[in-house]
Amino acid sequence: MKTLSTLFIVIILLFSGCLGIFEEDFDDDDDGFLDTIDAFPNDSNEWLDTDGDGIGNNADKDDDDDGFEDALESSCLSDPLNISSIPLDMDQDDICDVLDDDIDGDGLPNDWEINRSLDPLDNSDTLSCHGYSVYCLRSYDDFTFPESHNAYSALEDGVFMGVNHLTGLQAQWDGGIRAFMVDTHHVSSEDTSPEDVRFCHGSPNAFPHPCSYSEIDAFGWLSLLNSLMNSSKDTCLTLCGEVVTLLIENYVPAEHLEYLFNKTGMSDRIYIHNFGEDWPDIGDLILNGQDLVVFWEQTGDDKYPWLHDFGEFGWTTNYGESEPDEMKCTVFRGNGSQPVWHLNNWLSSIYGVADPIRSNEVNDYYFLLNRTIECWEMMDNRPTFVAVDYWENGEITNVTITINKMEHWSSDIPPHP
């Protein structure tokens, strides 16, 4: 009788639901999500499958199957659960705009553009320096300019004694030369007015006077250079420019040089550097309309701060050696602590003048490239200028193109241009 009573009580409890055996379970995996809305009712680790690919959101790296992983979308401020919400990537460089330092892909950082009133969201509102936007970020002393020694002394322009080049300024410019060594004299010992400034080579005390056997009109030459600098900007689809450097071996009063630069329109574009300060970026020089740097081979004059003493603001290697193996990388003249320097790369003939034959050897692409890298390594400083005679022989401009693509002397050498 007692057994029957116990059985009866159990049956009553079962049907009343008190023992829970017949109670329906609406959350089988006990993950807090009802089975009716749980995409994985028997997996306590998963409950959602936004893209319906059979992989739960917790395990799925791309919940909405839009091609962008969830972590990336979260960083890029797009919705990882909405297939129509994807990271913005204006320049399609696979870096979303939120994380991209160069949103429009023009090679210039966003902050750099904003600080210079350029639009970081418009790749047509940009700046190109020496053909590439990235060079705008280089400081003046962290770029290598091809340089012509005695640039005015060209057979094409009627110079027949002491020739240094076959072709004149126009061809040099078209060939990529952007730094020029020139010598300023008065046309004669008697004609010494500001209007009498010429480009000639030799000692002013020599007989005959150095301008007596060849002279180049300095006013016409600099006016052409000014025009070439202006016209290079006119051919660009966007803002662009190039920085030009003059190194003057001077034999006239400073006020006569001032007259020369004023008359040729060059004064307005000259940059004045304060000794001891960092050199500015090439881009800033161009944007500020100060795309001409002038050095002269004599002591500075406070009345003419734009005439930088090249021996104070920089230095130069030796020059005019007799043999290639005599060429050195070390300081010959000037202040070796300065970052701006000239790597001179020309030989003198047995007559003491430029050698048109052996210029082929020392201007050869691989010879000059290897020498430039060797000197860069030895001095732990990129050459600012590589200067040659007979620039037409060899590949001076191709060498500097290659060098400027290198961040460091130990960088991989890019292919021949």
Indicate residue ranges for each PLM-predicted region.
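Short, 15-30-residue, compositionally biased linear elements
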Residues: 2-3, 39, 164-168
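Extracellular calcium-associated, cysteine-rich motifs in secreted modular proteins
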Residues: 18-131
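Processing junctions and N-termini across compartments
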Residues: 9-12, 34, 53, 69, ...
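Catalytic cores of phosphodiester-bond hydrolases, prominently lipid phosphodiesterases
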Residues: 128-417
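Short hydrophobic "helix-edge" motifs at membrane interfaces and signal-peptide entry regions
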Residues: 6, 21, 95, 172-174
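Secretory targeting signatures
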Residues: 1-27
